[in-house]
UniProtKB/Swiss-Prot annotation:
Pfam families: Ank_2, CG-1, IQ, TIG. ANK repeats lie at residues 525-554. Gene3D superfamilies: 1.20.5.190, Ankyrin repeat-containing domain, Immunoglobulins. GO terms for molecular function: calmodulin binding; DNA binding. This is Calmodulin-binding transcription activator 6. It comes from Arabidopsis thaliana (Mouse-ear cress).
Amino acid sequence: MDGDGLGRLIGSEIHGFHTLQDLDVQTMLEEAKSRWLRPNEIHAILCGRIILFDRKMLRNFRKDGHNWKKKKDGRTVKEAHEHLKVGNEERIHVYYAHGEDNTTFVRRCYWLLDKARENIVLVHYRDTQEAATTSGDSISSPISVSEQTFPNRVAAEDIDTVVRNHDISLHDINTLDWDELLVPTDLNNQSAPTVDNLSYFTEPLQNAANGTAEHGNATVADGSLDALLNDGPQSRESFGRWMNSFISESNGSLEDPSFEPMVMPRQDPLAPQAVFHSHSNIPEQVFNITDVSPAWAYSSEKTKILVTGFLHDSYQHLERSNLYCVCGDFCVPAEYLQAGVYRCIIPPHSPGMVNLYLSADGHKPISQCFRFEHRAVPVLDKTVPEDNQDSKWEEFEFQVRLSHLLFTSSNKLNVLSSKISPHNLRDAKKLASKTNHLLNSWAYLVKSIQGNKVSFDQAKDHLFELSLKNRLKEWLMEKVLEGRNTLDYDSKGLGVIHLCASLGYTWSVQLFSLSGLSLNFRDKQGWTALHWAAYYGREKMVAALLSAGARPNLVTDSTKDNLGGCMAADLAQQNGYDGLAAYLAEKCLVAQFRDMKIAGNITGDLEACKAEMLNQGTLPEDEQSLKDALAAYRTAAEAAARIQGAFREKALKAARSSVIQFANKEEEAKSIIAAMKIQNAFRKYDTRRKIEAAYRIQCRFQTWKIRREYLNMRRQAIRIQAAFRGLQARRQYKKILWSVGVLEKAVLRWRQKRKGFRGLQVAAEEDSPGEAQEDFYKTSQRQAEERLERSVVRVQAMFRSKKAQQDYRRMKLTHEEAQVNHLTFLNLSFGKKNSNRR
């Protein structure tokens, strides 16, 4: 994970998981019992700060105590390997091994192809037959994450016996060996694990952003993980003892028939229900829970819970006794309200599903377990700046730069002193008439202040905004009078439209569109206003720019880091705005398709767009988001396929025209004759092949001894001839070398006073202009195809995150609303124009 404390995973632009909540490790580990891990899940795990295994420090990690299939020599393990792709590139190396005694028991070892992190290994054990036959309530074959992430944890059911019962300091943990961290476990006296034990894999991952991983009485910090990595098993013997102990304890606990997990499947977070177990591992149930209200709570606040139920007839005397409510890792008193109703207040808890039950002593449950959900606090829209000092100062800096550029780049004196063309004067008057509504804004602000309808801070913001609007109107009128020459930049190379886009001032788009200035104006780095709006995640600004005609398929100037440039979708993806990036990528492909259609390179329309316009109905929010994501992927895939087909067709036409240009009738006739010969030979190919095969079989069967002797004799004769020819060549070489030396010295040097053969230089052939132009075209086409592939990948990445689908849905609705507002604004502007003419 990144070190910024936000819990973002490294390499999110490759595997698609930005946070640990997106990765959902607990669900992934449950599903790993019945399926193999996906390449993007493996890449996300191996890229983080959580170290799984260091195969450079412990090279014998494959000697795990299992009996694997061997090669023919009987010593080496027979392993198959391949490379897995994450996206469009190979990034993971995987090795397979099958059991010798049990062929359905399989081991997979994964590590990254990246040289910087290739030493981290993830090992996955699974019995494929058990995963296909066992039910969802049983535990399948063991999954081994035998690495330094959890060095003091062996398995979920053995966690209380692996770690010491007393508090262990970081120094003690760093100095203990693997054998000292493990203690003998009595499998017969082992009790059924609780849900908290089963979820220990995900708790350290969720707490990794805070720098610690806690469980029970042991607290292991990130520094101790690195120390354990350095002080881990350094010999094959210690690692073998640890693996044998781990496998024996894991298998023993899994084969125990009394082990019945109390984990319920994850429910839909949008509609949680009170789900209980049909049976319980408790020897005798005292209290029967019928309802828990509420069924979920936010993880960052205290929550009051009402537990409703009834006591069994034989335990009615315990009605007013002191009971406890156990929720995850916390045990709080349960206050008696009335018969069968208890109230408790649970403290904040990390997000996830936990067990909730009543207990008499705070440990042993006396009721069935209820699955209670702690939800993460909803993240605010990324378009809204964070409420901290840095974001406020950054926004204020942009406002200062915009104000400075508007007030210092005025050319009123030059405009008034120069001769203004009638056309520019007429356009300036039109702009002034269309922007008269700003006077109404001033009047509304004065009335609001006098009537105390707005707060003081809102009044200041409105005043500042109106001042910028009026100054921008005057600035645009000056540029229209000058002939629309917008070459004003601030100290960092940004123009007015770029600063407005960075700040999210959507009102500036209407003024620029009315003035006739280009919305695709580039700054000194080649960025347009749409690039800046996408970079800062300004969804409303992006929608306004697209509605006003901004082009989403423009590319920034090339840099040393990115030779092909970046699109607006690439910039949004870099800052984590997946939904916005997918929407811009789709619009980029559609815009390029329409441009090529106008140019005559493509015919027809996109069928996906037609189907989307026809199939519009009312669906729930989640289904509508998924439907929009699927429609976007269909549109992007179809547009990319049509564009690539046009590229191939154009390249084929160019090759065909070049061939026709240099061809003549004689060559054409030869090609026709050659084609006829090929057709005639193809008709007789089958018969001739059978005859030749039969002849070769007969000859080899009859004369293989004679041929072998003949080949040996011929080989010896060839060697003798080669040796003789080499001897003659060496004799003649000395004579030729002496003759050339005499010729060079006598003739070229002494007589003609010139350089010898050593001074001869061959003139380099210069490339023709046509070849250079062709190379430039190929490079441009290759970069365009790469941009197409990136756009399709951006749209496809939405399916990895539900939040990205919701962001895409919100961006789509915002764009549709902006289009309606822009059309309404244009109609009002043209209506005023027609009324003035009348």
